[in-house]
A protein has these predicted regions:
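Hydrophobic faces of well-ordered beta-strands that scaffold small-molecule active sites
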Residues: 1, 35-37, 67-69, 97-101, ...
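N-terminal beta1-alpha1-beta2 module of alpha/beta enzyme domains
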Residues: 1-61, 65
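Flexible, glycine-rich active-site loops centered on histidine and acidic residues
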Residues: 1-13, 75-138, 178
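Short, acidic/polar
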Residues: 14-26, 163-169, 281-288
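Conserved, mostly hydrophobic/aromatic
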Residues: 27, 31, 39, 58, ...
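An alpha-helical appendage that flanks or caps ligand/catalytic pockets
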Residues: 119-147, 188-294, 325-326
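A conserved active-site cap/scaffold subdomain adjacent to cofactor or substrate pockets
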Residues: 168-187, 192-193
């Protein structure tokens, strides 16, 4: 599960974060493998900007599920600080922490510069900073003058996240697991996965390539209900295109009538990797997707306005994956 801590127009930020906790607790109980949270900034509808802080909150309320960043936008941060933050999390919750890294700012250009004045230079140094972060977390860093405490010597899985050929190239070259952001930028997914597998350079930690596809999933008792619930997600993406990033709105009927032709095309392209329907429909659609992509793991994000409906969608999606895995 990837959670963006999406703020709805009837909910405070505090309540939103506690709803994220509720979702994580349910995923933990149902047997989901991971619960990741994403770093975004200066977005009124997303409350997950302090990602490491939230991960500690979520980890403290769950027992088994892996907790991770999906992802930390590394150019926004010092690699040493990230090593210390995630080293702290791993020390508190051993064997449960994932560290996903992205190259984008998770915001607009002006905000990126406010976060870190040399962001664009750091973005170009992303491969170098990934290596530096790996070094800080390695037990072999003990001979260097700059060391991460906590962090050094801890086995924290590091993932490369992305939505382009650049990210797949880096993940393949470094022999790292790779997660693709198909939930908002699916255009290059198939090419990126193929390149990653064909050019994978085995590492000691990861002798074989490993892929995650993150997709949108909205499930309900009927496909008609699921499509209605999904209208809030469509409006969210429409607002992004219009540069009007307000909190998520309640679902509406005929949501596509709110868009002009170009807006509809853009939204449908961004959301083309979405699975919306009842249990049977999503089982068939998602199974075909897995067979085609040969992806190792599916991660879902579920943008639904009503909290109870979102939790129920999470329950249905667990049954969907159980059905697929049983085939």
């Amino acid at each position: 599960m990837l959670d963006l801590a999406v703020v709805t127009d009837d909910c405070s930020i505090g309540d939103t974060l506690y709803k994220s906790k509720d979702l994580a607790v349910l995923c933990d109980r149902l047997g989901y493998e991971r619960f990741w949270m994403a770093e975004h900034h200066n977005m009124e509808h997303i409350a997950s900007s302090a990602t490491a802080v939230l991960l500690g909150f979520i980890a403290g309320h769950t027992k088994r599920i892996r907790i991770g960043s999906g992802g930390v936008m590394l150019p926004n941060h010092s690699p040493l600080v990230i090593a210390e933050q995630f080293g702290t999390l791993e020390s508190l919750y051993p064997g449960r922490i994932d560290l996903g890294l992205g190259r984008a700012p998770g915001t607009d250009g002006e905000t990126a510069m406010a976060i870190r004045s040399d962001f664009y230079a750091q973005s170009q140094r992303f491969p170098e900073n990934v290596s530096k972060l790996q070094e800080y977390l390695s037990s072999e860093n003990c001979k260097n003058r700059v060391r991460a405490f906590p962090g050094e010597g801890l086995e924290i899985p590091i993932w490369i996240l992305g939505s382009s050929m650049d990210s797949s190239t880096l993940a393949a070259a470094y022999g790292m697991p790779y997660a693709f952001a198909g939930h908002f930028a699916p255009k290059m997914m198939f090419e990126a996965f193929d390149f990653y597998r064909e050019n994978y350079n085995p590492s000691e930690e990861h002798p074989k390539p490993y892929t995650i596809a993150c997709v949108n999933a909205i499930a309900a008792e009927t496909t008609e209900e699921a499509e209605f619930l999904a209208s809030s997600m469509y409006m969210n993406f429409l607002n992004i295109i219009r540069n009007d990033r307000k909190p998520m709105q309640a679902p509406v009927k005929n949501v596509k009538s709110l868009m002009n032709t170009m807006e509809r095309y853009q939204v449908e392209q961004m959301l083309s990797c979405s699975f919306i329907g009842d249990e049977d429909k999503i089982t068939e659609d998602l199974n075909r997707f897995i067979e085609y992509t040969k992806v190792d793991e599916i991660m879902i994000t579920c943008q639904i306005y009503d909290h109870k409906s979102r939790l129920h969608s999470c329950e249905i999606m667990k049954r969907v994956m159980d059905n697929i895995n049983a085939r």
